[in-house]
Regions:
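Beta/alpha (TIM)-barrel catalytic core signal, keyed to glycine-rich beta->alpha loops juxtaposed to Asp/Glu
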Residues: 1-160
Length: 160
């Protein structure tokens, strides 16, 4: 961590970079470097199918230290890997597409965007039609009971 901190400090001082972020760092790994230099971002695996950062204190740590979380693979395995978890989510999500008059992917992005940590989804598609729809994920607020119903479907149990 000290070698990384020294290298980043040098790059910041030289004006070669303006901000520094990490990827997939745990709170303890982040803290080792954060004690030496400011960390602006942590890119983590986060989606409705991969929401452990909500229960392992990763997101709480980032909120405390004002580190902006970026979610890579924000749609998770929802469209890729049928499982008991995705079936539970689909059962809750499909009626919400009617309620909110939107597509499943937009609801999945909206769910992430409503987290109080201010998570920034990293979009991995190059499909222009899908990219064109993405701004609609910011045009409505999912009701809290729907947000929690999706989280519970993902967890397979009542959430804390």
């Amino acid at each position: 961590p000290m070698v990384i901190a020294d290298a980043i400090s040098s790059l910041l001082a030289q004006g070669k970079i303006r901000q520094f972020g990490v990827s997939n760092f745990t709170p303890f790994q982040t803290e080792l470097i954060r004690q030496q230099i400011p960390i602006e971002y942590n890119q983590i695996s986060f989606s409705l199918t991969e929401c452990h950062p909500m229960t392992d204190d990763s997101l709480n740590y980032m909120m405390i230290h004002r580190i902006k979380p970026m979610a890579w693979a924000p749609l998770g395995s929802y469209f890729k890997s049928p499982s008991e978890k995705t079936a539970r989510i689909k059962e809750v999500l499909q009626p919400l597409t009617i309620k909110y008059e939107t597509q499943e992917d937009i609801l999945l992005y909206n769910w992430i965007l409503q987290h109080p940590a201010g998570i920034i989804p990293v979009v991995g598609t190059s499909d222009k039609a899908k990219i064109g729809r993405l701004p609609s994920a910011t045009t409505f607020r999912m009701e809290d009971q729907d947000w929690f119903a999706l989280w519970e479907a993902s967890m397979g149990k009542a959430v804390p």
